Amino acid sequence: MIQPRFSLTPLALAAGLFAAGHAAAQTVPDTTGQPIQTVVVTASADASAQGLPSDYAGGQVARGGRLGLLGNVDMMDTPFNTTNYTHALIQDQQAKSVADVVQNDPSVRVARGFGNYQELYVIRGFAVNSDDLAYNGLYGLLPRQFVASELLERVEVFRGANSFVNGAAPGGGGIGGMINLLPKRAPNAPLNQVTLGGESSGQVYGAVDIGRRFGPENRAGLRVNAVRREGETAVDAEERELSVFSVGADYRGQGFRVSADAGYQNHKLENARP
């Protein structure tokens, strides 16, 4: 039996090697010229790696906010109705308290409590007492009756089934929604801000806001706020005094974040209109 024999000529062998080399070259990805993604760490009251949701166009509201156990959620991804007011709006409108901020929301009405002078917020027809305001997602940490805006980085208004994601408010309110207040944190750049003001009624105002970051990679931060307001208001014979001091500290570690807040507020109102 005759067995056929096959032999490669030099030309065929060279063509085979060229084809193999060409195929191998296509399997190696080209990594030259690819940009390296830059990770920017920003200071925020939120412990997640992403930090607070970014500002919307104009900077006075944010694109998202905290939804209790769901964490920070973009406004286009949540089944609830939320509005998240930033520190820029607080400064632009010279808001004095939480009431001045939430009055921008058409679904929120502001009143005073029965028999006292606490701020009362009505969301979708249901009352939310100032006792039921949340501070960084937690109840029972804020002063009763009045919260100065100088303590706050953001004011988040949640409208809907509040207890489903945030838990029941201790005061029994919050049926139609809730208000969550976010504390200030030291920014990446040094902050030195002094504000002085006065009103035609005779009330004078002064505030100091200082923020610094320390240590390796600016991991530790400190934010200090001090406020003093005194004098007559726009209401005849009514006088208001306000003293506020707060300190917010935070540390950004490898895979964890730690923060602490301490504050003092003394609000005095004389000859107030009921």
Please place each PLM-identified region on the residue numbering.
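Cleavable N-terminal targeting peptides that direct proteins into the secretory/outer-membrane pathway or into
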Residues: 1-35
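Short, compositionally biased, intrinsically disordered N-terminal export/targeting signals
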Residues: 36-37, 224
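Acidic, small-polar-rich N-terminal luminal/periplasmic segments of exported/outer-membrane proteins
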Residues: 37-189
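Short, glycine/charged-enriched secondary-structure capping and boundary segments
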Residues: 170-174, 239-240, 274
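Outer-membrane beta-barrel domain signature
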Residues: 142, 166, 196-197, 234-236
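Short, charged, low-hydrophobicity "junction" segments
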Residues: 8-22, 127, 131-135, 195-198
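Short, structurally constrained coil/turn elements
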Residues: 19, 35, 104, 216-218, ...
